[in-house]
Design a protein with these regions (language model features):
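ABC family nucleotide-binding domain
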Residues: 19-233, 238
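Conserved beta-strand-loop-alpha-helix hinge in the C-terminal portion
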Residues: 237-261
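Glycine-rich, flexible loop segments associated with nucleotide phosphate handling
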Residues: 17, 36-41, 251-260
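Pre-NBD coupling/linker segments of ABC/ABC-like ATPases
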Residues: 2-16
Length: 270
């Protein structure tokens, strides 16, 4: 059964472990007094360590705004975002880049690989910037590549890879620093069904084997069915969530479809 949030917030009691992410009554407004847009309207949610969570909602529901606030790219108008025990609003501007690199991993719809670097060098980039010793970089890069099944492309350049391989290289780059939280923004949006399946199976496997915590924005019900929990947002707040529990992926997909039908559809425009 879907749980409808009586205050527009997801349940804060997820597990006994310390939450990786806590979003508390966050608002985000744009414009002036005469034309104010409320992108986030009392948004609250909690993600525990090791969760694989999908965020779904129609165009204009606040998905991208929320992700930008969590990523410290944008700042909320009010409310609190706690990431790995740190209030992100209190991080100095000079520390933000280091905080993102150390605590967060990013997977975008487009892989955003550097064309002049091999897959190995692209994956290693956040470690190189962080001045990790070369021997450790090689060990970590090989391990990340192995977890995503892309060892054979490590010495290839992006133009020599398929779209699916490029996206898995991007995922390896996001995971190589062992971040507290991976933010995946429509990671399968540019992939065909075969490559989307390979990426989602890899993320699911990494979540289960390495305990990686992943928050994925998606409009795709199939992609969401790989997650353990789905949060549906509307008008800038969570209004329903589904927990997979013991369901098979197919059964969970059917439950997701039921909620989407009631909600009136989830489109790919954000």
């Amino acid at each position: 059964m879907a749980r409808h949030m009586d205050s527009g917030s997801a349940s804060l009691a997820r597990s006994a472990s310390t939450p990786v992410l806590e979003v508390r009554d966050v608002t985000k407004t744009y414009g002036g007094h005469s034309a104010t847009t409320h992108a986030l309207n009392g948004m609250s949610l909690t993600i525990a360590a090791g969760e694989f969570v999908a965020l779904m909602g129609p165009s204009g529901s606040g998905k991208s705004t929320l992700l930008n606030c969590i990523a410290t790219i944008d700042a909320p108008t009010s409310g609190t975002i706690m990431l790995a025990g740190t209030d992100v609003s209190r991080i100095s501007r000079s520390r933000l880049a280091d905080f993102r690199r150390e605590k967060l991993g990013f997977i975008f719809q487009d892989s955003n690989l550097l064309d002049s670097l091999t897959a190995r060098e692209n994956i290693a980039l956040p470690l190189t910037i962080g001045r990790v010793p070369a021997a450790q970089i090689e060990t970590d890069v090989v391990a990340a590549a192995a977890s995503l099944g892309i060892e054979e492309v490590l010495d290839k350049y992006p133009y020599q890879m398929s779209g699916g391989q490029r996206q898995r290289v991007a995922a390896a780059r996001a995971l190589v620093t062992n971040p507290q939280l991976v933010l995946a923004d429509e990671p399968t949006g540019a992939l065909d069904s075969k490559n989307a399946k390979l990426l989602l199976e890899s993320l699911e496997s990494i979540n289960q084997s390495r305990g990686a915590t992943v928050l994925m924005v998606t409009h795709d019900e199939t992609a969401a069915s790989y997650c353990r929990r789905v949060l549906f947002i509307r008008d800038g707040r969570v209004f329903t969530e589904l927990d997979r529990g013991a369901d098979s992926r197919h059964a969970f997909f059917e439950r997701i479809m039921q909620v989407v039908a009631v909600q009136g559809g989830v489109d790919d425009a954000r």
